[in-house]
From Swiss-Prot:
Keywords: Membrane, Transmembrane, Transmembrane helix. It is a single-pass membrane protein. GO terms for cellular component: membrane. The chain crosses the membrane at residues 70-90. Almost completely overlaps PNO1. This is Putative uncharacterized protein YOR146W. It is found in: Membrane. It comes from the Eukaryota.
Length: 101
């Protein structure tokens, strides 16, 4: 049985969303910095970064919850390229994350 940290699932999702939106990567930052700390500035950006940092402190308790966490990836891929990470999106991820974890 493999226990995955929820941050292991969420960070690739954010990366996929940013690549799909054509995020202008900076050559002076790492992918992780770009993913978490260099999102377009909005009130929800800090909330999303907090969500990622909070989720890194928790691990899934079973393989079934880890498998359910993979649902984040198709959800991100279904978002249109112009869809910003709004408060509604952040609230959705918090609700789904709380349900899964």
């Amino acid at each position: 049985m493999i226990f995955l940290d929820s941050n292991f699932i969420l960070l690739p999702c954010v990366l996929l969303a940013e690549v799909k939106r054509g995020f202008p990567w900076s050559s002076t930052t790492t992918v992780l910095d770009s993913c978490v700390f260099r999102l377009p500035s909005s009130p929800s950006t800090s909330s999303f970064a907090v969500l990622l940092s909070e989720s890194s402190n928790r691990t899934s308790s079973s393989s079934s919850s880890s498998m359910l966490s993979v649902l984040f990836i198709p959800i991100i891929l279904l978002l249109p390229p112009s869809c910003p990470l709004t408060g509604v999106t952040v609230a959705f991820f918090k609700a789904v994350g709380a349900t899964i974890m």
